[in-house]
């Protein structure tokens, strides 16, 4: 696939699975734009925008942001992008979001190319999230409001309840493949690439 062709990759997996890290590397190595709704929303919160003030309590509680807000953010990000070469990290999270994204991508002539699902045991996920917060604090950086054990466990539960239909959706379309998300960054990355072939 050349860099002038459309490529749409959707990373799935629970919070703390390493989606952001792996998506960043894949984006850099394959000239893709990484779209993280979480990063976009956190930026709005940090800047104190109207949207940021609207979603801050939702994010702090570990709940999912309403679909209409996320779809509008994605539509805005993809406007004018040709070819469409993107990685979605943290979106879609529900079947309704997947259907809305598919409709948007269909309008752009850029169907989903691959959907790697990173699988990591729950306790490993919790440990990673708490450690991420500890490391940020040790470096004197701002700690994400959701990088604590209680919120992390709630996010895992929300993920399981709301994302399973999404996994079924992409599996049914033959676009999903499972990746063992435990191991070194290079090991996991190599598994992702192998699954995309």
From Swiss-Prot:
Xref: Pfam families: ADK
A single GO molecular function term of this UniProt record: adenylate kinase activity
Cytoplasm keyword on record: yes
Protein's cellular compartments: Cytoplasm
Gene3D superfamilies (UniProt xref): P-loop containing nucleotide triphosphate hydrolases (3.40.50.300)
Primary location group: cytoplasm
PROSITE patterns recorded: ADENYLATE_KINASE
Keyword Metal-binding: no
Region named LID: 131-147
Keywords, alphabetical: ATP-binding, Cytoplasm, Kinase, Nucleotide biosynthesis, Nucleotide-binding, Transferase
Region NMP: start-end pairs: 36-65
Assembly with partners or alone: Monomer.
Family per similarity comment: Belongs to the adenylate kinase family.
Domain commentary: Consists of three domains, a large central CORE domain and two small peripheral domains, NMPbind and LID, which undergo movements during catalysis. The LID domain closes over the site of phosphoryl transfer upon ATP binding. Assembling and dissambling the active center during each catalytic cycle provides an effective means to prevent ATP hydrolysis.
Biological role: Catalyzes the reversible transfer of the terminal phosphate group between ATP and AMP. Plays an important role in cellular energy homeostasis and in adenine nucleotide metabolism.
Protein name per the record: Adenylate kinase
Lineage: Bacteria, Thermotogati, Deinococcota, Deinococci, Deinococcales
């Amino acid at each position: 696939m050349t860099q002038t062709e459309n490529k749409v990759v959707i990373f799935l997996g629970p919070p703390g699975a390493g989606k952001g890290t792996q998506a960043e590397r894949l984006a850099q190595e394959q000239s893709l734009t990484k779209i993280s709704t979480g990063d976009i929303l956190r930026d709005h919160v940090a800047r104190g925008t109207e949207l940021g003030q609207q979603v801050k309590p939702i994010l702090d509680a570990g709940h999912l942001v309403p679909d209409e807000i996320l779809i509008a953010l994605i539509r805005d990000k993809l406007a004018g992008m040709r070819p469409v070469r993107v990685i979605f990290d943290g979106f879609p999270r529900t079947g309704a979001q997947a259907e809305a994204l598919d409709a948007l991508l269909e309008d752009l002539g850029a169907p989903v190319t691959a959907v790697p699902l990173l699988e990591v045991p729950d306790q490993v996920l919790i440990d990673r999230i708490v450690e991420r917060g500890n490391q940020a604090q040790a470096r004197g950086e701002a700690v994400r409001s959701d990088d604590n054990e209680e919120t992390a466990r709630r996010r895992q539960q929300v993920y399981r309840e709301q994302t399973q239909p999404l996994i079924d959706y992409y599996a049914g379309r033959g676009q999903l493949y499972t990746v063992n998300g435990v191991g070194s960054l290079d090991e996991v990355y190599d598994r992702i690439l192998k699954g995309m072939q």
